[in-house]
Design a protein with these regions (language model features):
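Conserved N-terminal beta-strand and adjoining loop/helix that marks the start
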Residues: 1-15
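Short loop/turn microsegments at loop-to-beta-strand junctions
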Residues: 3-4, 42, 94
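Active-site-adjacent beta-strand/loop module that shapes the phosphate/pyrophosphate-binding cleft
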Residues: 10, 66-88, 95-97, 101-103
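Conserved Nudix-box catalytic region and its N-terminal flanking loop in Nudix hydrolases
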Residues: 14-49, 53
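A short coil-to-beta-strand element that immediately follows conserved catalytic motifs
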Residues: 58-67
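NUDIX/MutT-family hydrolases
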Residues: 88-120
């Protein structure tokens, strides 16, 4: 299963992180928002769709940072920027926040996501 995840910066240079719902899978972990690719969909289109569905935000994807594999899940991490936060709406996460790269390390991340953060400039 392919999953596209977005490491997206706001105009101040902070990364948007989402706190997963306490009742769903992997509860109370912080994540780079994204989701599963649908049949026939490119990873970039998947990521843009997921950000609209989950956060009501338009994003501009700049590049693929890395790809990781955990069990049968292949995560593709893209870096980019949020076009505008004015219409931000939380639809899936219990909370979202904007964090500096150093502050992202302090969050409860999925195993291995700290290594993804290490790759950021």
């Amino acid at each position: 299963m392919d999953v596209a995840c977005g490491i997206m910066y706001d105009k101040a240079g902070n990364i948007l992180m989402g706190l997963r719902d306490s009742r769903g899978p992997n509860p109370n972990y912080w994540e780079f928002p994204g989701g599963k690719r649908e049949d026939g969909e490119s990873l970039e289109t998947c990521l843009q769709r997921e950000w609209m569905e989950e956060l009501n935000l338009h994003i501009e994807i700049e590049y693929l940072l890395c790809t990781t594999t955990n069990n049968n899940v292949i995560c593709h991490f893209f870096v980019g920027k949020i076009i505008d936060t004015e219409n931000l709406r939380i639809n899936v996460h219990q909370y979202i926040g904007f964090y500096s790269k150093n502050d992202v390390y302090k969050l409860r991340l999925f195993e291995g996501d700290d290594k993804v953060v290490d790759m950021l400039k």
